[in-house]
Swiss-Prot record:
Family: Belongs to the LamB/PxpA family.
Protein name in the entry: 5-oxoprolinase subunit A
Source organism (scientific name): Halalkalibacterium halodurans (strain ATCC BAA-125 / DSM 18197 / FERM 7344 / JCM 9153 / C-125)
Record flagged with keyword ATP-binding: yes
Taxonomic superkingdom: Bacteria
Biological function: Catalyzes the cleavage of 5-oxoproline to form L-glutamate coupled to the hydrolysis of ATP to ADP and inorganic phosphate.
Pfam families: LamB_YcsF (PF03746)
Assembly information from the UniProt record: Forms a complex composed of PxpA, PxpB and PxpC.
GO BP terms, alphabetized: carbohydrate metabolic process
Keywords: ATP-binding, Hydrolase, Nucleotide-binding
Reactions catalysed: 5-oxo-L-proline + ATP + 2 H2O = L-glutamate + ADP + phosphate + H(+)
Molecular function per GO: 5-oxoprolinase (ATP-hydrolyzing) activity; ATP binding
């Protein structure tokens, strides 16, 4: 039977500000990417979100980003290999501390926002991220855009990698995501988003914005939980995957070295 993971970016509240609906999203996904304080989140939110995810048996992952609270980690920042390596270590280790407190093992690491997108194309950035993860714990699973430089960098080091696809994002002919600055970046119709996911999972391809068919691997599907219709969409997607004979489960249940 075919298996796939559903992941969502969580723990993005900080201080007096509440972002997202983490408690409810955790009812429907199998892996949680938890912000580590640089682009969103803080120490209290990290502690709470790890506990919530641990109590529900989720696969728990660190979601490190650029040090950019004002831009929510979505602004490209030019820096060097060592800086990227160090801020990945800093954030991943911080979240791992909360995992240790709750006696759960961290499952994965997924970079956030601009860092994720830059690592998809830039080999130097991708290698800095992969090296940091490997040096912290080589058993961690690296989430990256399917077929990207980040996936290649992880494989090169011997990390277990999870090819990630997106339910609500459109794709460029080169397999990258359409930038959020473009009008057609997001898929807002739940039926269309569901169809795209089923095609990626069952047929290993996706239709790009120019109509071309791109081969794609789908180990984990990113669903966003911060819109008014997010929960109903995630429920529908989960149900449709089951109808198609796909088991939804965390990646550590089926990806091994």
């Amino acid at each position: 039977m075919q298996r796939v993971d559903l992941n969502s970016d969580l723990g993005e509240s900080f201080g007096a500000y509440t972002i997202g609906q983490d408690d409810r999203v955790l009812e429907h996904v199998t892996s949680a990417n938890i912000a580590c304080g640089y682009h969103a989140g803080d120490h209290n939110v990290m502690a709470r979100t790890v506990k919530l995810a641990a109590d529900k048996g989720m696969g728990i992952g660190a979601h490190p980003g650029f040090p950019d609270l004002l831009g929510f980690g979505r602004r490209n920042i030019q820096t060097d290999h060592k800086d990227i390596y160090n801020f990945i270590v800093y954030q991943v280790a911080a979240l791992n501390g909360f995992c240790q407190l709750h006696r759960v093992r961290m499952q994965h690491v997924k970079p956030h926002g601009a860092l994720y997108n830059m690592a998809a194309k830039d080999r130097v950035i991708a290698e800095a991220i992969a090296e940091a993860i490997y040096d912290i714990d080589p058993s961690l699973i690296l989430f990256g855009l399917s077929g990207s430089e980040l996936i290649k960098a992880g494989k090169k080091l011997g990390l277990t990698v999870a090819n990630e696809v997106f339910a609500d994002r459109t794709y460029q002919p080169d397999g990258t995501l359409t930038p959020r600055s473009e009008a057609n970046a997001l898929i807002k119709e739940s039926e269309r988003a569901t169809e795209q996911v089923i095609q990626m999972v069952k047929e290993s391809k996706v239709i790009a914005v120019d109509g071309s068919h791109i081969p794609i691997e789908a180990d984990t599907i990113c669903v966003h939980g911060d819109s008014p219709t997010a929960l109903s969409f995630i429920e529908r997607l989960h149900a449709q995957l089951q109808v198609e004979g796909v088991t939804v489960t965390k990646v550590s249940d089926f990806l091994f070295k």
